[in-house]
Amino acid sequence: MPAQDVLTRKTGVIVGDDVKALFDYAKEHKFAIPAINVTSSSTVVAALEAARDNKSPIILQTSNGGAAYFAGKGVSNEGQNASIRGSIAAAHYIRSIAPAYGIPVVLHTDHCAKKLLPWFDGMLKADEEYFAKHGEPLFSSHMLDLSEETDEENIGLCVKYFTRMAKIHQWLEMEIGITGGEEDGVNNEGTSNDKLYTTPETVFSVHEALSKISPNFSIASAFGNVHGVYKIAAALKPELLGTFQDYAAKQLNKKAEDKPLYLVFHGGSGSSTKDFHTAIDFGVVKVNLDTDCQFAYLSGIRDYVLNKKDYLMTPVGNPTGEDSPNKKYYDPRVWVREGEKTMSKRITQALEIFRTKGALE
């Protein structure tokens, strides 16, 4: 049975119970869905093409900085103005174009630290306004990353926001524990390795608090994962995810194989296939992939410019003749497309590694 058979909406942006149904299907069939950070219509297209061509669902997400970029670097971000407008603009663009690709898309937003909560508030306001008109939120889901705060404050704020989100049937992703490296608004590059691991008890305390509100939430716990790519990384321990599931199952009087938690793998760039498979087998349903995609997008454009440099120095004049026009070489639709193709290729690799490929067949 293909994944689309469990969804009421087969293509385009899915919301509410469909998001849970997709994650349930992924957990049961032991695959994870790549979450691709998008910053422009071009990166959106690259991700959608890869998913369509590999018959896979996909998660598209905007970060705080990525959303501001989507709005335009010339727009002031005072009061999170650009980030709010950019994320909403991206959401409407993705909603309009995603059905053309014939695949289900989860529309998500990435890390929101406490200092960025005005951004979250602006998006949630847009969700509620959209819900009033259409009976569903604008975004499928949002992420709160309050891992810099105490666990008590982290969970308390998540409960506060999730109570509001549940009223519009929206999924919440939260982070507990510290993921190393740097991601929009959260910098943990100086964190010692021993702090990069969450305990089963802490993870379950999140489940205990949020499950009273709605089952529609996932947990990004720390198991040595790091944002970005570094020469020396922390010791990744995906087997810890199994202990989180086992502890939760025991507390809930369920079988260990039930894997009651929806888990998320942050800092996926640069990890091994073995680590991904171990994490997915323990209930990871979403893997964030940003840094690798950024480099892949650059590589296509970089290689094009290097290979065609003799055609890009002047509007007219190249090795074929001093009067030969170069417009077909410097047209942005040509060289930007090269970045889309290499980014799409990198996402295709992820779809294969995460076992997502063919999930819609």
From Swiss-Prot:
GO biological process, one term: glycolytic process
Residues the record marks as active site: 110
Residues that, per the record, bind Zn(2+) 2: 145, 175
Keyword terms: Glycolysis, Lyase, Metal-binding, Zinc
Catalytic activity: beta-D-fructose 1,6-bisphosphate = D-glyceraldehyde 3-phosphate + dihydroxyacetone phosphate
Residue sites binding dihydroxyacetone phosphate per the record: 228, 267-269, 288-291
Residues the record lists as binding D-glyceraldehyde 3-phosphate: 63
Pathway annotation from the record: Carbohydrate degradation; glycolysis; D-glyceraldehyde 3-phosphate and glycerone phosphate from D-glucose: step 4/4
The UniProt record lists the keyword Repeat: no
Cellular component terms per the entry's GO annotation: cytosol
Cofactor note: Binds 2 Zn(2+) ions per subunit. One is catalytic and the other provides a structural contribution.
CDD domains for this protein: FBP_aldolase_IIA (cd00946)
InterPro entries linked: Aldolase_TIM, FBA_II, Fruct_bisP_bact
Required co-factors: Zn(2+)
Function in brief: Catalyzes the aldol condensation of dihydroxyacetone phosphate (DHAP or glycerone-phosphate) with glyceraldehyde 3-phosphate (G3P) to form fructose 1,6-bisphosphate (FBP) in gluconeogenesis and the reverse reaction in glycolysis.
Family classification: Belongs to the class II fructose-bisphosphate aldolase family.
Subunit organization: Homodimer.
Entry protein name: Fructose-bisphosphate aldolase
Organism: Kluyveromyces lactis (strain ATCC 8585 / CBS 2359 / DSM 70799 / NBRC 1267 / NRRL Y-1140 / WM37)
Gene: FBA1
